[in-house]
Amino acid sequence: MKSKFLKYKADKVELWLYVSMLLVAAMIILGGATRLTNSGLSITEWAPIKGILPPLNNQSWVSEFEKYKLIPEFLAEHSDMDLSGFKTIYFWEWSHRQLGRIIGLVYAIPLIIFIISKKIQKEKIFNFVGVLLLICMQGIIGWWMVSSGLENDRIDVSQYRLATHLGVAFIILACLFWLWKNQKERWPEISKKNSLTRYTKILTLLVYLQIILGAFVAGLKAGRTYNTWPLMDGDFVPRGYMRLDPYWKNIFENISAVQFNH
């Protein structure tokens, strides 16, 4: 197996998919940093083309800051923020969106070239194009998420939309890995179905579920509710776990239940 690995040379399609995976992973990390710095609502408009460039002069910065001052989050949490502080949070959100544009171009342009040059097998084109559509849809989902934090009296984005945005990001990453893995099967003997691969799939699904539950924790800021472990304020199952009606809402909207489930 080692000799096969040493002799193996990746083709251009595999390298392209590998770079795409790294960029998506970086995007997920940058998205987490954007959330932790409370920067996600700093850009109050969705401008896929016009938004490529950040504000280039002081007047433009002031204009963007004035837009931010109109949303509930500023009034509730950042009312003492100055222009310098706004530039910092703006940078995080702008960088997140910019990386999204880069991912789209890095995936789309080589895809077109590889299809024209027949580097991708005809029967696989649908799968590759499907991932491109997912990437495009993710941009729309991102704005759909952000817009929920600009409406009414909300000071945070919807936890449902946050979980959707994060969930789709990991689906894109998984699809890229699947395309990369199947582009040229390296070691057929270890790719056969066995009990280990079944357990790996189950574990992968559980990890994905945990990630989604974590998104609900982040969206509701439920992680701040209980600071004891393994008991939650002295109870294994926190009091009020099923306090919402209908009961299914507890899974997604009850802070105690959301933290316990995670």
Residue ranges with predicted function:
Residues 1-261:
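Polytopic transmembrane helical bundles with strong interfacial aromatic enrichment
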